[in-house]
């Protein structure tokens, strides 16, 4: 009788006006309960589900967006300072940031394996393993950092080999030298970030990043204008700012009582299965790297066009604007990855699917608004970065391509977040190879160089690759069997209990 009464009470609660139950929905009426309540009309279930999911999603997405915007803003502010030193310095900083983003993508991608595992383990209430995953991932990423350090030490001859102008290559290599210590900051930052996100802890990272941005802008102004350190001063301050974030983030994880169940101190268990974890994270790294490197290749190819300085400056400004809007989508990427992995770990297939489409729709609407703002301000937006009229005109001409890219980026990163939450990274990596590097870049090179459409031609081809990838991910997500995904998540976590969690 008690079970029957509870069911009746829950149905009555669901049928009440939303204003009466709004504060109780996330805690007392779970999303899965709403979506599976057959006694409710379909529209009512969707409406209640949207209200619950938007609260859960935005609570994760908004702080995550702020974190990514601030972190992206650190790189953009460095370009702004460089741009006001001169066009050559702007080109050098742009080529340096674009080149260094390769290791950023690698570390971010490998860190995404933590997001899958920690998210599903947290949803299944296996809290004690989260700290082990964090330590193991940090060790693996730090080891990967050593060969990357050697690679970037030889950035000058590599840039020359890629056909970049000698002056830009030399100044860009000096700029990169000042960024090299960031490699190991990334190794700690991304694993800790995913550890926090899996537990829906995002706001503290936003506060830390905001403090770092203020520190960076202040110190950069001092080193550039008061101390006259120029481009190298900009690079050194950027590195210091990243290490400030890492130090504050690490201190928070170790000392906060909210992680008493998930962080139990350093453990020798973290040294076990490093090679297995490396293989698992490699799939995540390939997926993310292929996505992030794709846009950076556009900037590198611009250095081979007829007027490389103008092309680099205009495209780097467009990419900076695109990166800012992209951070909004990446925030939803992080949120939906946590939501889907938590729901799959908890055994809630309908909630995982509902979260996927809710995040995709909201991110798409925001991206359309952003694209309209870019088109409306196309003649003025570039003056934030430069005072050169020729560069401003070139940016204005490229804004329609930028607007289309922003809209596509409103969908694609969210679907990639779903892939991370579900553990589809390897499959998506193959999709990225085909769409980006077999279709997008070759078509872009043909249009840009053979048909002489220059930067517009390269960008057109790359938009085509992104569109193809987005359509494929939409289809795969639509066709997914979410009950099977729950079972896969359960088996993956059972493997962890068998002490062989990373064996496929």
UniProtKB/Swiss-Prot annotation:
It is found in: Membrane. The chain crosses the membrane at residues 56-76, 90-110, 139-159, 170-190, 208-228, 234-254, 273-295, 316-336, 356-376, 401-421, 433-453, 457-477. One of its GO terms (cellular component) is membrane. It comes from the Eukaryota. The keyword Membrane applies. GO terms for biological process: xenobiotic detoxification by transmembrane export across the plasma membrane. Keywords: Membrane, Transmembrane, Transmembrane helix, Transport. It is a multi-pass membrane protein. One of its GO terms (molecular function) is antiporter activity. Belongs to the multi antimicrobial extrusion (MATE) (TC 2.A.66.1) family. This is Protein DETOXIFICATION 38. The lineage of its organism: Eukaryota, Viridiplantae, Streptophyta, Embryophyta, Tracheophyta.
């Amino acid at each position: 009788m008690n079970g029957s009464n509870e069911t009746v009470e829950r149905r009555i609660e669901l049928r009440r006006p939303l204003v009466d139950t709004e504060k109780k929905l996330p805690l007392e009426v779970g999303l899965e309960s709403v979506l599976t309540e057959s006694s409710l009309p379909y529209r009512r279930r969707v409406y209640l589900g949207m209200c619950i999911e938007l609260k859960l999603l935005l609570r994760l997405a908004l702080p995550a967006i702020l974190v990514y915007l601030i972190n992206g803003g650190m790189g953009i502010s460095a370009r702004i300072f460089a741009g006001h030193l001169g066009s050559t310095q702007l080109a050098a900083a742009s080529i340096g940031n674009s080149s260094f983003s390769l290791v950023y993508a690698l570390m971010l991608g490998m860190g995404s394996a933590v997001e899958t595992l920690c998210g599903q383990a947290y949803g299944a209430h296996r809290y004690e393993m989260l700290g082990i995953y964090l330590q193991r991932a940090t060790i693996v990423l730090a080891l990967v950092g050593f060969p990357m350090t050697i690679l970037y030490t030889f950035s000058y001859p590599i840039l020359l080999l890629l056909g970049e102008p000698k002056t830009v290559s030399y100044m860009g290599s000096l700029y990169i030298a000042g960024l090299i210590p960031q490699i190991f900051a990334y190794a700690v930052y991304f694993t800790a970030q995913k550890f926090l996100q899996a537990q829906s802890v995002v706001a503290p990272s936003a506060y830390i990043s905001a403090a770092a941005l203020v520190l960076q802008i202040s110190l950069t102004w001092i080193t550039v204008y008061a101390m006259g350190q120029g481009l190298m001063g900009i690079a050194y301050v950027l590195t210091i700012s990243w290490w400030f974030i890492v130090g504050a983030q690490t201190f928070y994880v170790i000392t906060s009582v909210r992680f008493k169940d998930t962080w139990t101190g350093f453990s020798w268990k973290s040294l076990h299965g490093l090679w297995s974890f490396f293989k698992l994270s490699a799939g995540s790294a390939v997926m993310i790297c292929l996505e992030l490197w794709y846009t950076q290749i556009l900037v590198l190819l611009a250095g081979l066009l007829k007027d490389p300085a103008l092309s680099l400056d205009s495209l780097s400004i467009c990419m900076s604007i695109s990166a800012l809007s992209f951070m909004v989508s990446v925030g939803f990427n992080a949120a939906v990855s946590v939501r889907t992995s938590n729901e799959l770990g908890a055994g809630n297939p309908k909630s995982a699917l509902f979260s996927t489409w809710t995040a995709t729709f909201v991110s798409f609407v925001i991206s359309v608004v952003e694209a309209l703002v870019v088109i409306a301000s196309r003649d003025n937006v570039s003056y934030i970065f430069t005072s050169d009229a020729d560069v401003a005109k070139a940016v204005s001409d490229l804004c329609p391509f930028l607007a289309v890219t922003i809209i596509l980026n409103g969908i694609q990163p969210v679907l990639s977040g779903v892939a991370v939450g579900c553990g589809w990274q390897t499959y998506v990596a193959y999709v990225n190879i085909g769409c980006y590097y077999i279709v997008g870049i070759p078509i872009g090179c043909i249009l840009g160089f053979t048909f002489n459409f220059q930067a517009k031609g390269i960008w057109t081809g790359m938009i085509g690759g992104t569109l193809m990838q987005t359509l494929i991910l939409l289809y795969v997500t639509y066709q997914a069997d979410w009950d099977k995904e729950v079972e896969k998540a359960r088996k993956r976590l059972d493997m962890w209990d068998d002490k062989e969690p990373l064996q496929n």
